[in-house]
C-alpha cells in the first residue's frame, strides 16, 4: 500500500462524516491559511456550518494575550483534493466582539454588493488572474536557466512545446480542480513571459467573484505545493524587458448589457477617471513596478481609455463598441490585488457615486 492510496481513501461507504477545510486570509492580506475539521454529515449551505476560531497571534492578526480570531463561513466549494462530500469553506475573520478584523475586506465589499442600487444592476465580473511559477530553491521562473535568462518574449504567449511552455501540468490540474470545486473558471492560457500563466474566473455576480478568485488561488497554491514549485502573484517578478502580472477586471452592469449600454459604459469610465488615486492605491502592492506605460500597461499616474487599446487604463472591446452594449476591462489591478476590494470599489464608483 502506498501513501497515495491512503490519501485517496474513499470514505463514502464507511462513514457519513465529512471533512470541511476552512480557508481564510492571513496577516499580509495575501497569504492563505487553512485548517480542517470533521462534521457529522454533508453540508450544502454556509449557514449550516459552525463558526470556528484560530490563533491570530500566529498569523500576524492578533496580540498573544488576546489571540482568538473568529471564522465566519461564507461560501462552500467541493473539495477537489479529498473529493466525495468533503468541502472547502471560504471564511472571513472577526474579533470575538463581532467586528471585522483589518484584513477582512470581504465584510465591507458585502455591504456594497447588498446595496439596493448595486443589487438592481446585477454586477458581472470576469477576472483574468495572472501568476508566475518559480523554481523552489532558487526563486527563479520555471523553465529559466538558473541565474540566467531565456530568449526574449515573443514565442511564449499561448505557446506549446518543451522549450516554450513551462508548468502546464500545474495549470491543467488547477483548471480541472476548479471546475470540480464549482468555481466558474472560464479558461486558461500561457502568458507573454515564460513561466507565467493566466486563468480566468467569471462571469460571476457580485461578492461571489471575490470568493471564487480566493478559492481558485488556494487550490492553485495547494497544487504547486504538491508539484514542488513556488507560486508568486508579484506584479513584476523579473525586472527589465519582461511583462508584469496583472488581474485585468472585466465588468458590466445590467444597464451596460442592455440597448444603449455603451453610453452608460462611457459615463462609468469617466467616473473611474475621477477617482484615479483611490483606485490605484487599492489595486495591489508594488503595482508601480508594473504600470509603466510599457509591456501592455498604462502609466500609473495617468488615466486613459480606448477601444481595443491594451496600453490604456481601461479597454473597451470592439464587439461592445459595435453592438452598443457590453462590458469594459479595467487593466490596472495587479495580480496580487484583493478581489473583494477591487470588485466592490468598481461597483461603488460606477453605481453609487453620483456625478
Swiss-Prot record:
Molecular-function annotations in GO: ATP binding; glutamine synthetase activity
GO biological process: glutamine biosynthetic process
Annotated SMART domains: Gln-synt_C
Intrachain disulfide bonds: none
Location of this chain's protein in the cell: Cytoplasm
Domain GS catalytic span(s) in chain numbering: 105-355
A Pfam family this chain is assigned to: Gln-synt_C
Catalytic activity: L-glutamate + NH4(+) + ATP = L-glutamine + ADP + phosphate + H(+)
Main location: cytoplasm
Keyword Ligase (UniProt): yes
Keyword ATP-binding: yes
Subunit structure: Homooctamer.
Family: Belongs to the glutamine synthetase family.
UniProt protein name: Glutamine synthetase nodule isozyme
Species name: Pisum sativum
Amino acid at each position: 500500500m502506498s501513501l497515495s492510496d491512503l490519501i485517496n481513501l474513499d470514505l463514502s461507504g464507511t462513514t457519513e462524516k465529512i471533512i470541511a477545510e476552512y480557508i481564510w486570509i492571513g496577516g499580509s492580506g495575501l497569504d492563505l491559511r487553512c485548517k480542517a475539521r470533521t462534521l457529522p454529515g454533508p453540508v450544502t449551505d454556509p449557514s449550516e456550518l459552525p463558526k470556528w476560531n484560530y490563533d491570530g497571534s500566529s498569523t500576524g492578526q492578533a496580540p498573544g494575550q488576546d489571540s482568538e480570531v473568529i471564522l465566519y463561513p461564507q461560501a462552500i466549494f467541493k473539495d477537489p483534493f479529498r473529493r466525495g462530500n468533503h468541502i472547502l469553506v471560504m471564511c472571513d475573520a472577526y474579533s470575538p466582539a463581532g467586528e471585522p478584523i483589518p484584513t477582512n475586506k470581504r465584510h465591507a465589499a458585502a455591504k456594497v454588493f447588498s446595496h439596493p442600487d448595486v443589487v438592481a444592476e446585477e454586477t458581472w465580473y470576469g477576472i483574468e488572474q495572472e501568476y508566475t511559477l518559480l523554481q523552489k530553491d532558487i526563486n527563479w521562473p520555471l523553465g529559466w536557466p538558473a541565474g540566467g535568462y531565456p530568449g526574449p518574449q515573443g514565442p511564449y504567449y499561448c505557446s506549446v512545446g518543451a522549450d516554450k511552455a513551462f508548468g502546464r501540468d500545474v495549470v491543467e490540474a488547477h483548471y480541472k480542480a476548479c471546475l470540480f470545486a464549482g468555481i466558474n473558471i472560464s479558461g486558461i492560457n500561457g502568458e507573454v513571459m515564460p513561466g507565467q500563466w493566466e486563468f480566468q474566473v467569471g462571469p460571476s455576480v457580485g461578492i461571489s467573484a471575490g470568493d471564487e478568485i480566493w478559492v481558485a488561488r488556494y487550490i492553485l497554491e495547494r497544487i504547486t505545493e504538491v508539484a514542488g514549485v513556488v507560486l508568486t502573484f508579484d506584479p513584476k517578478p523579473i525586472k527589465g524587458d519582461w511583462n508584469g502580472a496583472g488581474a485585468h477586471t472585466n465588468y458590466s452592469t445590467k444597464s451596460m448589457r442592455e440597448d444603449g449600454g455603451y453610453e452608460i459604459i462611457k459615463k462609468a469610465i469617466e467616473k473611474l477617471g475621477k477617482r484615479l488615486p483611490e483606485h490605484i492605491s487599492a489595486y495591489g502592492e508594488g503595482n508601480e513596478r508594473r504600470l509603466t506605460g510599457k509591456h501592455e500597461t498604462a502609466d500609473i499616474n495617468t488615466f486613459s481609455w480606448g477601444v481595443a487599446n491594451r496600453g490604456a487604463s481601461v479597454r473597451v472591446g470592439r464587439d461592445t463598441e459595435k453592438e452598443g452594449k457590453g462590458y469594459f476591462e479595467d487593466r490596472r489591478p495587479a495580480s496580487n490585488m484583493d478581489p473583494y476590494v477591487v470588485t466592490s470599489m468598481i461597483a461603488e464608483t460606477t453605481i453609487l457615486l453620483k456625478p
